[in-house]
Design a protein with these regions (language model features):
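N-terminal amphipathic/basic-hydrophobic helices that include classical n-h-c signal peptides
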Residues: 1-23
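Short internal beta-strands
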Residues: 137-148
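Short, glycine-rich nucleotide/cofactor-binding loops
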Residues: 112-121
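A conserved regulatory-domain signal marking ACT and ACT-like small-molecule sensing domains
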Residues: 20-110
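Adenosine-nucleotide cofactor-binding segment
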Residues: 154, 158-184
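Residues that mark the start of a beta-strand
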Residues: 109-113, 209
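Donor/substrate-binding cores of folate-linked one-carbon enzymes
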Residues: 146, 169-175, 184-307
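Histidine-anchored nucleotide/phosphate-binding helix
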Residues: 121-132
């Protein structure tokens, strides 16, 4: 994190300029600022004066908090500046206007690790969509605390690593997982029904880069076995929530949610079946939003721009 409060993210080859085709020479800027007059004009003028074409621009003003949010996707094909020059110039500009920002270059896909336990539906969905080109990322490994889903990884030809908790030593197991994540240069961790609570130290290593799917419409039915508890309460709709994982269980910023209506005729098994479908689509939407750099986190909330 820069002293002025912004972060710069690259692909695998950090801090290098890439010579890819024009179609990949794009960048996304995410901007957050106290709302003020002239802000939009100042930002767009900066890009115009430096010869950038704005391909897509979205903005939102939170009138309750007085905050302004913007997502800008730029064409870098005709950029005469180096990336370092662009970053230095925009840093000075951001300091002058007093806003925070991050910039992402699109010429390298993010590297995603999927953590699972014994349930396969979310894993299958992510791998299938990735294989079909619907999720713009690389998945170099799958990690589990059980061996049950190794056959799924084999089917998609993704390396599988089993990291069990031996004699209750969860700290050693997490250290093993973290070593794998570092070795494979992982940008995003997806908890696809990984049924272990991560330690504070783990989540702090990947702030806003761990996405969890919770099989309930948070904040209702936090923790385990939500479908049984939902049935016991006689709920008339069930849902799922994807959120960034933090030190507090199921309390991280919410990215995506969905629900379906049910009736008294649905038993716990039927609720679980319906819920599995909701979980898949909610997790996929959240992961896609992160990969496409459409999320700005603000406190315990998120601003998620549409596609």
């Amino acid at each position: 994190m820069h002293k002025y409060g912004f972060a710069i993210y690259y692909g695998d080859d950090l801090k290098q300029d890439f010579n890819f085709g024009k179609q990949m020479k794009q960048a996304v800027f995410l901007i957050q600022s106290p709302d003020r007059k002239g802000l939009v004009s100042g930002i767009t003028t900066f890009f115009y004066r430096n010869g950038f074409n704005i391909l897509h621009c979205q903005q939102y003003t939170d009138t309750c908090e007085g905050e302004y949010y913007m997502r800008v996707r730029l064409d870098l094909s005709d950029m005469e500046l180096t990336r370092k020059q662009l970053e230095d110039d925009f840093s000075a500009f951001a300091t002058e206007y007093g806003f925070r920002y991050s910039v992402y270059y699109l010429d390298q896909p993010q590297r995603v690790a999927v953590l699972v336990s014994k349930t396969s539906h979310c894993l299958y969905d992510l791998l299938t969509l990735n294989q079909e080109g619907e999720l713009p990322c690389e998945i170099p490994l799958i990690i589990s605390n059980h061996p049950d889903l190794e056959h799924v990884a084999d089917k998609f030809r993704v390396p599988f690593f089993c990291c069990p908790i031996v004699n209750g030593d969860k700290a050693s197991q997490e250290a093993q997982i973290l070593e794998l994540l570092e070795r494979h240069l992982i940008d995003l961790v997806v908890l696809a029904r990984y049924m272990q609570v991560l330690s504070n130290g783990f989540t702090e290593r990947y702030p806003r880069r761990i996405i969890n799917i919770h099989h309930a419409f948070l904040p209702a039915f936090q923790g385990g076995n939500p479908y049984q508890r939902a049935w016991e309460r006689g709920v008339k709709m069930i849902g799922a929530t994807a959120h960034y994982a933090t030190a507090e269980l199921d309390e991280g910023p919410i990215i995506e949610q969905d629900v379906e209506r049910i009736t008294h005729e649905a038993d716990p098994a039927e609720l679980k079946h319906i819920g599995s479908g909701i979980e898949k689509r909610v997790l996929t939407r959240a992961v896609r939003a992160h990969l496409e750099h459409r999320i700005i986190t603000t406190g315990r909330r998120t601003v998620v721009f549409s596609r």
